[in-house]
Amino acid sequence: MSAALEKPQIIAHIQKSLNYTVFESKWIPCSAKFVCMGNFARGTGVMQIYEIQHGELQLVREIEKSKPIKCGTFGATSLQQRHLATGDFDGNLNVWNLEVPDSPVYSVKAHKEIINAIDGVGGLGIGDGAPEIVTGSRDGTVKVWDSRQKDTPVVNMEPTEGETKRDCWTVAFGHAFNDQDRCVCAGYDNGDIKLFDLRNMSLRWEKNIRNGVCSVEFDRKDINMNKLVATSLEGKFHVFDMRTQHPSKGFASVSEKAHKSTIWQVRHLPQNRDVFMTAGGAGNLHLWKYEYPAQRSKKGADDVEMGVAGSVNLLQNVTLSTQPISSLDWSPDKQGLCVCSSFDQSVRVLIVTKLNTV
């Protein structure tokens, strides 16, 4: 067999045009359904649930809301309830029962401006401790919410007095390997990456990567921090080895410039934490594998342990659209099944083959 065929292939299985701008698509856990979130041209928000049936997409339900919906997560819900938490253009955090979506089961005015990003942990059997939701907004704040607590966040991470407010573009939970430890990573428009330790209520680490940070994700939320990928505006992404933190040098990292345009998102494969996909502004997807170095840490000149970065290998890439792919989500249940949505107002179901051989 030729080498090209032995590599994973990214196959566009189903494509569907939509009559609205779609910002996020998420698989509904334990199902062949996914939900798309966005806004109609008339300025209202929309959630559509699609089901894959006989190789086609069937619209199961369409829900219209007063405000455009920017982002969503199932990360803080149980597998039984499967409630969707969303952030909208008005700064509202809502949690919906998609079976009865008329009014939210939890609602709070979370931010003064648009909620750009949302993540959840402690639900779906992923991560120990209480289910929590984190939101990041244009108002410069990052807040952690517990849906059992009305109106006020559990944690509010905001700039100190006199510090300029930066637009927060992306948030992610990690390090939730027991019921005390938990971290939030946030990325900002000026290139800042900040790692907040929720156990000690402190800023554990910060770094500037010089370009706006579009997406951050830990390779797993529910383990002792292992790796973090951050993507940016100029087509560059960084992989940080989070196992060893040097007091002054921080975490070791490797960077790669793959796309010629903004990398909108990164998503790790749920079944293999060393494989991840990046989604680009020119409508392309790149599939990567991280290779660990022979030794992940070494003693520096000051006799203090420091991390050693590995390398990244490009497994496959494909161009699906002329417009940015703004959202990407792997199926947690079926390896290689993936949904992505683009600013060409369409949603695509992809199949990535041979992932068990990489």
UniProtKB/Swiss-Prot annotation:
Pfam families: WD40. Keywords: Apoptosis, Cytoplasm, Repeat, WD repeat. It is found in: Dynein axonemal particle. GO terms for molecular function: ubiquitin binding. GO terms for biological process: apoptotic process; axonemal dynein complex assembly. WD repeats lie at residues 64-106, 116-155, 163-206, 208-250, 258-298, 320-358. GO terms for cellular component: dynein axonemal particle. It comes from the Eukaryota. InterPro entries: WD40/YVTN_repeat-like_dom_sf, WD40_repeat_dom_sf, WD40_rpt. Interacts with PIH1D1; the interaction associates DNAAF10 with the R2TP complex. Interacts with several dynein axonemal assembly factors. Key assembly factor specifically required for the stability of axonemal dynein heavy chains in cytoplasm. PANTHER family: MRNA EXPORT FACTOR AND BUB3 (PTHR10971). This is Dynein axonemal assembly factor 10.
